């Protein structure tokens, strides 16, 4: 998460959406950077409204003085990125503290079904729709950009900071192909209905 109210923006770091690359590129323009642990880096919008928005207000940055922005990935693509990320070789080691999250021996369809059922630790990765949900009675995220149009987010942030900034890649998931049966894909799209409503409205569509 980047807090740059002096430049007119706050960037929420949604998971599996290029947030590390954006943070690395624009961190020098931010007043505060929340990167570790992941639970803090990926603070939800509601969490921001509860804890950080009042802090910024107390420092002379009322909510209307900056825009809150984030990235939203196509839901099934987002889920497959988690599946691929948790198949990395490091997690295959039984002595690794996060070995229980290893998905190297799980098909994507098995992962998707476990995700919908909430039955396995390795498939507990949250929901994108909950990440952007505001607190009751409060304003929504100002701008949500599609992951496949990160160029639009970069252009927006460059305009805010007043200079061209080059964005690289970081924290990428391993390459791994997958197959979904038509039945499972249909169920997954129905499960992700709230996410698809947000994705369809996101900037870049």
Which residues fall in each region the model found?
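Membrane-interface amphipathic segments in extracytoplasmic regions
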Residues: 1-205
């Amino acid at each position: 998460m980047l807090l740059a109210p002096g430049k007119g923006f706050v960037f929420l770091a949604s998971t599996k959406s290029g947030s590390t690359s954006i943070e690395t590129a624009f961190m020098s323009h931010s007043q505060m950077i929340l990167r570790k642990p992941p639970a803090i880096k990926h603070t939800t919008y509601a969490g921001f409204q509860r804890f950080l928005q009042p802090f910024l207000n107390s420092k002379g940055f009322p909510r209307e003085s900056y825009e809150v922005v984030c990235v939203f990935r196509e839901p099934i693509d987002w889920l497959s990125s988690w599946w691929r990320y948790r198949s990395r070789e490091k997690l295959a080691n039984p002595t690794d503290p996060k070995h229980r999250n290893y998905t190297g021996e799980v098909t994507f369809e098995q992962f998707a079904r476990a995700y919908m059922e909430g039955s396995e630790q390795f498939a507990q990765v949250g929901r994108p729709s909950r990440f952007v949900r505001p607190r009751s009675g409060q304003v929504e995220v100002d701008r949500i950009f599609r992951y496949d149009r990160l160029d639009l987010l970069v252009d927006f942030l460059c305009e805010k900071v007043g200079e061209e900034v080059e964005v690289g890649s970081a924290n990428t998931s391993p390459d791994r192909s997958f197959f979904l049966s038509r039945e499972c894909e249909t169920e997954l799209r129905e499960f992700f209905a709230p996410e698809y409503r947000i994705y369809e409205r996101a900037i870049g569509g």
